[in-house]
Amino acid sequence: MKKVFLMIATGLLLTTSCNQKVKVDEKIKVVDSETMEEITDMAAATGVNNTFVDIALPGPQGQTVRVRDYVGQNKLVLIDFWASWCGPCIRELPHVVKAYELYHGKGLEIVGVSLDKDKASWLAAIEQTGQKWPQMSDLKGWDCEGALFYGIQSIPANVLINEHGKIIARDLRGEDLINTIAQQLQ
């Protein structure tokens, strides 16, 4: 019985988020203490109550998209980390679309950061899921510069930034996302 429970629990855990998976024989990274300190510092720097870190990556047509171009011009900016191959991301996107539809005209902008590697899949998913907001991706998967800056280890993930550039929330889902945005825009 314990084995069955553990198998079910493991299955549920694996389906709740898309985690970075690296085969040991495929990719081994040795991280020295100095590099680990830099990673830790960056993760701490992008936590709640800190100033956002700008991301500048190619957009769908190759143009450079910068988060800083939206912060300050909007009351709130949501950086949404996702990928076309991530089932939980696709299931969460209707909530993000709903938030955009309800609050875009009231001061919300969303900037999507895709962890895709295939441009055609990325662009098709944008269209199929109704994402009308700015998008960016360097098509490097988990090595995406933006994901590294924000210490993203699983997706979907997001960062909510106020008009002053302060990170006010991270990893909001479903109704929590919509309710937090509503409260911040009052």
Which role fits each region the language model picked out?
Residues 78-82, 114:
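Structural cue for short, hydrophobic secondary-structure segments
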Residues 130-131, 138-184:
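Thiol/disulfide oxidoreductase modules built on the thioredoxin-like
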Residues 81-98:
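Conserved redox-active cysteine motifs that mediate thiol-disulfide chemistry
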Residues 51, 101-143, 148-155:
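Conserved segment of the thioredoxin-like fold in thiol-based oxidoreductases
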Residues 58, 62, 118, 177-179:
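Extracytoplasmic and endomembrane cell-envelope/extracellular-matrix remodeling and assembly machinery
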Residues 56-77:
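A short beta-strand-turn-helix
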Residues 1-54:
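N-terminal targeting signals for export/organelle localization
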